[in-house]
C-alpha cells in the first residue's frame, strides 16, 4: 500500500467512525484470490476499544454488486457481516468484525457434524429465497462454458505447456456439453459461487456467517453444496459427504425446493456439478499462479484432480463423454502435472 493510500484510508476511517485519525490503527489480516485486501481496524478512545473490518476493493471487483447482494441477504435475514459504510468511488467498505474463526479453523478442533449442519441449514435458507431477476444474472450455458474454458487456456496450455490438438479439443467439447446438460436439468436458485470453508465465519456456538458473496448468481441448485462438501481446502470421505448431502437434500424437500423422489437425480447432479467446478478450478488456480503471482494455490491441484478422478470413475460407464475425458486426461495431462514442482501427490 502506498503512503498516499494509507493516508486516504485513515481519513476515511476517522470520518466514518467519528474519531480522530490518531485513534485509528489498522492491520492487514487477509487477502484472497482477488485483488481485495482486508484490514482489522482498531479504534481506541478514552471510553472504549472497538474493532471493525475495512475491505479495500478495486473498481474491478463487483463493488456495486457486493452492496446490492449484501442488501438482499440482509433483508432476507441471512447472516452476513453488517455493512456500516461504503464508498464505491474509493473502494472502501467498513464492515462488522466477525472475529478470526473461519469454518476451516473451527473444523480442526470442533464437531464436523454440528458445523456442517449449521452451514447446510444456512445454505437451505438461501436456496429458499425468491431472487428478483433485477438483482442477479443467470448461470447460463455460456457462463458455465466460459468457466470450463479457463482450464484448457490456463492449465493445459500454460501451466502444463501442452499444445492443443484436434482430438483433445473434441474430447473436451463433448465433455463440456455433457456437464452443461446436467446443469440445465437442475432447479435454479441463489448461488454464492464460493460457499466453502474459507468463506464462512463461525460465531456463537455453531452459527455461521457468510462472506465473499459479491459474485453471486442464479444457477444450479447443487453448485454451492458441491463447493462446501467437495471443498478443495478440506477433504472428507465420500460416505461422510453423502451423509451430509442426504440431510441437505431432505431440508430442500421440506421447504418445497425438491420432490420426495428426487434423491437419485440430486446425487447425480451433485457429482457432475462437482466435475464442472473442479475442472474450472484447475484453470483458475493456474491463472492465479501465472498471472497474479499467487503460486500457493497450486499446492491444492492434486486434491482437485482427485475429485475429478473420483467423479469420472463413478459416471464413466453411464456417460461416455466423461470416460473419454478421463482417459485423455490420464494419458496426456496427468503425467505432465505429476512431474511439476508444485505437484505433491495424495
Residue ranges and their predicted role:
Residues 22-27:
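Conserved N-terminal boundary motif of the eukaryotic protein kinase catalytic domain
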Residues 35-42, 54, 126, 176-225, ...:
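Active-site acidic catalytic loop and adjacent metal/ATP-binding pocket
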Amino acid at each position: 500500500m502506498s503512503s498516499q493510500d494509507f493516508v486516504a484510508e485513515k481519513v476515511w476511517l476517522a470520518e466514518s467512525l467519528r474519531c480522530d485519525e490518531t485513534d485509528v490503527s489498522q492491520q492487514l489480516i487477509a487477502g484472497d484470490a482477488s485483488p481485495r485486501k482486508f484490514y482489522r481496524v482498531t479504534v481506541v478512545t478514552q471510553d472504549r476499544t472497538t474493532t471493525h473490518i475495512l475491505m479495500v476493493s478495486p473498481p474491478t471487483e463487483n463493488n456495486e454488486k457486493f452492496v446490492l447482494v449484501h442488501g438482499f441477504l440482509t433483508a432476507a435475514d441471512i447472516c452476513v457481516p453488517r455493512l456500516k459504510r461504503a464508498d464505491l468511488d474509493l473502494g472502501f467498505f467498513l464492515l462488522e468484525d466477525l472475529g478470526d474463526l473461519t469454518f476451516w479453523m473451527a473444523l480442526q478442533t470442533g464437531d464436523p457434524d454440528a458445523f456442517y449442519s449449521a452451514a447446510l441449514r444456512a445454505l437451505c435458507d438461501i436456496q429458499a429465497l425468491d431472487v428478483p431477476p433485477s438483482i442477479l444474472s443467470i448461470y447460463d450455458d455460456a457462463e458455465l462454458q466460459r468457466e470450463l474454458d479457463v482450464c484448457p487456456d490456463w492449465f493445459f496450455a500454460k501451466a502444463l505447456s501442452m499444445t492443443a490438438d484436434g482430438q483433445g479439443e473434441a474430447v473436451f467439447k463433448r465433455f463440456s456439453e455433457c456437464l452443461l446438460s446436467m446443469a440445465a436439468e437442475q432447479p435454479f436458485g441463489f448461488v454464492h459461487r464460493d460457499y466453502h470453508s474459507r468463506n464462512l465465519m463461525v460465531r456463537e456456538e455453531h452459527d455461521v456467517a457468510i462472506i465473499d458473496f459479491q459474485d453471486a448468481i442464479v444457477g444450479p441448485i447443487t453448485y454451492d453444496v458441491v463447493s462446501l462438501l467437495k471443498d478443495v481446502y478440506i477433504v472428507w470421505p465420500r460416505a461422510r459427504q453423502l451423509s451430509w448431502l442426504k440431510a441437505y437434500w431432505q431440508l430442500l424437500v421440506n421447504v418445497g425446493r425438491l420432490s420426495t423422489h428426487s434423491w437419485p437425480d440430486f446425487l447425480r447432479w451433485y457429482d457432475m456439478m462437482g466435475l464442472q467446478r473442479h475442472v474450472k478450478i484447475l484453470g483458475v488456480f493456474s491463472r492465479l499462479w501465472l498471472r497474479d503471482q499467487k503460486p500457493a494455490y497450486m499446492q491444492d491441484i492434486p486434491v482437485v484432480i482427485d475429485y475429478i478422478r473420483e467423479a469420472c470413475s463413478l459416471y464413466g460407464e453411464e456417460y461416455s463423454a466423461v470416460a473419454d475425458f478421463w482417459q485423455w486426461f490420464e494419458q496426456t495431462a496427468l503425467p505432465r502435472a505429476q512431474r511439476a514442482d508444485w505437484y505433491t501427490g495424495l
